[in-house]
């Protein structure tokens, strides 16, 4: 089928160099030329937004001599262009301007002199966001935890002063020009196929049903370890630099010997292999250690999608990153979580077997929520006591003590509501930002909306992770996106409940890997998030499993 072949070839000719330059840019490689990624991005956007493909595809689909594979491939491209086409010249202009503005903000942000002021010497100490996060969670002295948190929060004012405001305004202009309420509404429809209103009906229900649990959890920590405990030398558990340390800082330190960075890669490979997860000849490129100039959040990208061409499989080529801060407490478990998370993304995109690369790329119409379900389901395994009993070993090969595992399970349960509501902070804040009128769009109004969202979702004095320090908000690809993690967490609980009810155990069960590959991964984006979750679990997507878990008494 000439049209199908042309689309497959032209798309790969644009997608592959764009993703390769994306990697060079985000990794801070010397080979990355300023503006190179933006140029490739603009070329790809011009292709995917070209409305002239739609009548050609509709006409081709009328043919009676198409093979099943050809019809499926053409239908995939039709949906791809229906989602991505931009007919308005003004909208195309806005897209081009946004790519350039976002690229400049990214370059400026990565050059930011980030760090903390040493509370004893008064000296400014440079530190990455990864190191600051670890310090906030694990440093034994409150003054240093606070200094690290303040270092993270400094990102907020910095991005507001260096280009984020005009980007928000222009994004909203694009969203309205595309026929939506605002940019957030546009992005939700683009990736998930339903409206912002529908999304927040789901999230509002989750917020309501977890409200009492999170307040109870924070109050309990304050009673046991904070100001209400009656102990000497206590700190306020409700301060954002104290809550994480009081709930898990000591546990993180005691678990640390069993999660060495040097063992992370082997444990990821052994665990995924035992689950029956295969990468089908994919080439994986890993960049795992933190360094200056490197993008400060783990991610996966796929320069070469996995797809089938006339019966021949083209394996995926995938890169993913972690930001391990070697020698720091918690760096080993952080690296392992990233390997399971980003390696989960890689497993998903390596197992797509459809007759066009449009089914196996990670952008619209691929669902953000569904993609994150795969990675978050797999990184959830590390928190299971049976996984720890089998894989968590110290340097002498000794297993993690049972009491540490039990404490980890208890902590995970106690903080379940807090953790999912911490995720909720970002979409609620970002929604509020994009709902500001242009005349009200300034740094103070944005910060006020962010603080309102923090106060609504998490009963601390502020969010443990300052909202505008979350890099997703700055990038065009991941802005108005974070709700996908919340929907994914709900789908993870539903998926886990299904497997546990069916098999009794997930650990090292190859039947789990087989079902993931067949029901979740193979179809690519030929089905929606809601359809895929129901196909596997046999039940419509809902918050039921999440709410039941969060509110269950130990």
State where each predicted segment sits.
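Alpha-helix capping and helix-loop boundary segments enriched in small/acidic/polar residues
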Residues: 194-197, 255, 259, 324-334, ...
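N-terminal helix-rich structural modules
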Residues: 1-158, 480
């Amino acid at each position: 089928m000439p049209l199908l072949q042309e689309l497959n070839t032209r798309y790969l000719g644009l997608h592959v160099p764009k993703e390769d330059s994306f990697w060079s840019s985000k990794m801070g490689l010397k080979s990355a030329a300023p503006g190179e990624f933006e140029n490739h991005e603009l070329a790809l956007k011009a292709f995917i937004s070209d409305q002239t493909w739609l009548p050609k595809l509709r006409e081709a689909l009328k043919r009676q001599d198409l093979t099943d594979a050809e019809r499926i491939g053409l239908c995939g491209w039709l949906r791809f262009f229906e989602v991505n086409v931009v007919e308005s010249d003004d909208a195309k202009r806005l897209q081009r301007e946004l790519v350039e503005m976002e690229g400049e903000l990214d370059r400026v942000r990565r050059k930011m002199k980030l760090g903390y002021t040493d509370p004893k010497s008064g000296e400014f100490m440079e530190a990455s966001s990864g190191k600051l996060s670890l310090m906030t969670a694990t440093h034994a002295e409150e003054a240093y935890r606070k200094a690290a948190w303040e270092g993270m929060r400094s990102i907020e004012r910095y991005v507001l002063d260096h280009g984020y405001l005009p980007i928000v305004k222009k994004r909203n202009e694009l969203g309205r020009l595309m026929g939506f309420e605002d940019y957030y509404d546009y992005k939700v429809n683009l990736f998930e196929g339903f409206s912002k209103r529908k999304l927040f009906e789901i999230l509002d229900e989750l917020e309501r049903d977890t409200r009492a649990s999170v307040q109870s959890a924070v109050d309990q920590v304050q009673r046991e370890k904070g100001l209400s405990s009656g102990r000497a030398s206590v700190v306020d558990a409700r301060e954002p630099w104290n809550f994480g340390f009081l709930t898990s800082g000591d546990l993180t330190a005691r678990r640390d010997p069993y999660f060495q960075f040097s063992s992370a890669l082997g444990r990821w490979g052994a665990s995924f292999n035992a689950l029956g997860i295969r990468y089908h000849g994919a080439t994986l490129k890993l960049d795992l250690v933190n360094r200056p100039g490197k993008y400060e959040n783990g991610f996966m990208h796929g320069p070469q999608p996995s797809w089938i061409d006339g019966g021949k499989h083209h394996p995926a080529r995938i890169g993913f990153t972690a930001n391990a801060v070697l020698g720091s407490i918690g760096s080993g478990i952080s690296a392992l979580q990233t390997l399971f998370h980003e390696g989960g993304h890689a497993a998903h995109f390596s197992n797509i077997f459809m007759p066009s690369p449009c089914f196996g790329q990670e952008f619209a119409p691929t669902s953000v929520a569904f993609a994150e379900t795969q990675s978050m389901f797999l990184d959830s395994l590390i928190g299971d006591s049976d996984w720890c009993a089998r894989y968590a070993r110290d340097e002498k090969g000794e297993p993690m003590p049972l009491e540490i595992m039990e404490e980890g399970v208890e902590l995970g349960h106690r903080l379940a509501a807090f953790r999912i509501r911490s995720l909720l902070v970002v979409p609620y804040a970002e929604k509020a930002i994009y709902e500001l009128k242009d005349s009200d769009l300034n740094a103070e109004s944005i910060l006020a909306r962010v603080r309102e969202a923090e106060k609504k979702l998490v009963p601390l004095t502020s969010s443990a992770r300052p909202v505008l320090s979350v890099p997703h908000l700055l990038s065009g690809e991941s802005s108005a996106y974070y709700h996908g993690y919340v929907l994914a967490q709900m789908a993870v609980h539903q998926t886990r409940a299904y497997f546990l009810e069916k098999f009794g155990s997930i650990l090292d069960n190859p039947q789990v890997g087989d079902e993931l590959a067949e029901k979740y991964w193979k179809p690519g984006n030929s089905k929606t998030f809601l359809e895929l979750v129901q196909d596997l679990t046999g039940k419509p997507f809902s918050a039921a499993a999440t709410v039941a878990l969060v509110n269950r008494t130990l």
